Amino acid sequence: MIFKIGDLVTRNSYHNDLLFKIIDIEDNIAYLKGIDVRLYADSELDDLQLVEENLLIKKKEDREEVTKLQKMIQLDRSEYFYLPGKILHLDGDKDYLERCISFYKEMHLEAYGINIKEKDMKEEITKYLETYKPDIVIITGHDSFKKGAKDKDKNANYQNSSNFTEAVKETRKYEKSQDKLIIIAGACQSNYEELIKAGANFASSPKRINIHALDPAIIASLVALSPKNKEIDLLSLIEKTHYGSAGMGGIITSGTMYVGYPR
């Protein structure tokens, strides 16, 4: 079978469990990017299965996700008005960023997206914090636990956990309080414990699994739409993500939305 860049495929050796897009081909090797999970991979061409799936289906699934969350959030708009928290989303992947920004728009949230390489986040993040003055900041992109590595406690054994951790630390220099600025950090298989120790309110990945492209955005949206100074049910919040507490975790956190009266 002849494959080309842009084709949607699955991998036979992994029981065709995840959907990827081919982003490059060299000789007999295809370089892949996950459609739903924040994951890069490579594969021999003869291990790939072509998938005739339209990306419009994924957009429909995202809209269904929005509808599901909106039904969970009961806001009395007859007498009260609401000012949700502002979101700053830094993402190492342009496609995932665009998908998350579309998600925020569907949720009627004020969100600013920055496509930036993970290695540059530490140096650049303060500039964006000062410009947008967010209530919630997301630090994400791509990550993975390196092949052959054994110690899951060391950031050096991850593709980008060190970059995410340093960006979180820089953010905490800007705002020390975990109540005033909510940080959501990490990507697939990230070093969860180090991100939490660095100052993140929420992070991936407790069980070092892959996370869904929208998981950080789901948490950010629910925090943005929860009343300020009211603690959010942590377990319920985490379970709203695609893989639950295996993929995302965090600390008890209050919402960022102001509630006003009269409307």
Could you describe each region identified by the protein language model?
Residues 36-81:
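Intrinsically disordered, low-complexity, charged/polar segments
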Residues 129-142, 200:
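Proline-aspartate-enriched helix->loop->beta-strand connector
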Residues 101-112:
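Short helix-loop-beta junction
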Residues 207-263:
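C-terminal functional extensions of proteins
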Residues 16-27:
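Short beta-strand-centered aromatic/proline hotspots
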Residues 163-211:
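Catalytic cores of nucleophile-dependent amide-cleaving enzymes
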Residues 28-36:
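Short, solvent-exposed secondary-structure boundary/capping segments
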Residues 1-14:
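Short coil-to-beta transition motif at edge beta-strands of beta-rich domains
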